[in-house]
Amino acid sequence: MENQPKLNSTKEVIAFLAERFPLCFSAEGEARPLKIGIFQDLVERVQGEMSLSKTQLRSALRLYTSSWRYLYGIKAGAIRVDLDGNACGQLDEQHVEHARKQLEEAKARVQAQREQHQAKKREAGEATAPRRPRKPARKPAAEGEQSRSVSGKPSRPQAARPASAPRAESRVEQRKPVTDTTALQVGQSIKVTAGKNAMDATILEISKDGVRVQLASGLAMIVRAEHLQF
């Protein structure tokens, strides 16, 4: 008996009871309603086994009978069972209603926790940089649109467009997308693509989550490598 293994957690105790009394307890699936006063039966039947104490048995019963799968089994017409699976009377309406309220409260708590977790994730997401990459091929068109908006005549200067296009292309060709952040250095000047524009920025920090840069406007943000160009 001195070398008998001990059950350290409440879940281990429940697993032991399911193995010891399979017609009464279950480790998974819908659980059967237990006989009223089954705690005393447990004390008498398993006293000394696996060095279990009354406190451990009481905690295991409390966890077992408050689980969702047990509460689902508490319904009208269900029969209580003893340790050997023998019928010990039908559930009354009071116990069924009590179990229903317990289940509703448990679900409400889980839903509230889930909504709180999602709210925290949304708050954290608002602090991150834009994550919608744009195709590089659209950048020259964006620069052309800017030049037309400055002139105020988007359709008439047709002859000037072929001359300005090579200059835009040459500027794009001079930039190279960043494929390896190890080639970057703190303090290095860099281009940040956001939407259809490329903005000047300075590298503040390089980490596994991205590159922290400061724009010419003074705004600091974390961006991913695909939004950076030399």
From Swiss-Prot:
Biased composition range(s): Basic and acidic residues: 105-125, 168-178
A UniProt-annotated Pfam family: ProQ
Region (Disordered): 105-182
Stretch forming the signal peptide: none
GO cellular component: cytosol
One biological process term in Gene Ontology: post-transcriptional regulation of gene expression
Alphabetical UniProt keywords: Chaperone, Cytoplasm, RNA-binding
GO molecular function, one term: RNA strand-exchange activity
Keyword Metal-binding: no
Keyword check for Chaperone: yes
Biased amino acid composition, Low complexity: 154-167
Top-level division of the source organism's lineage: Bacteria
Compartments, as annotated in UniProt: Cytoplasm
Family: Belongs to the ProQ family.
Function: RNA chaperone with significant RNA binding, RNA strand exchange and RNA duplexing activities. May regulate ProP activity through an RNA-based, post-transcriptional mechanism.
NCBIfam families reported in the protein's UniProt record: PRK04950.1 (NF003434)
Protein name per UniProt: RNA chaperone ProQ
Species of origin: Erwinia tasmaniensis (strain DSM 17950 / CFBP 7177 / CIP 109463 / NCPPB 4357 / Et1/99)
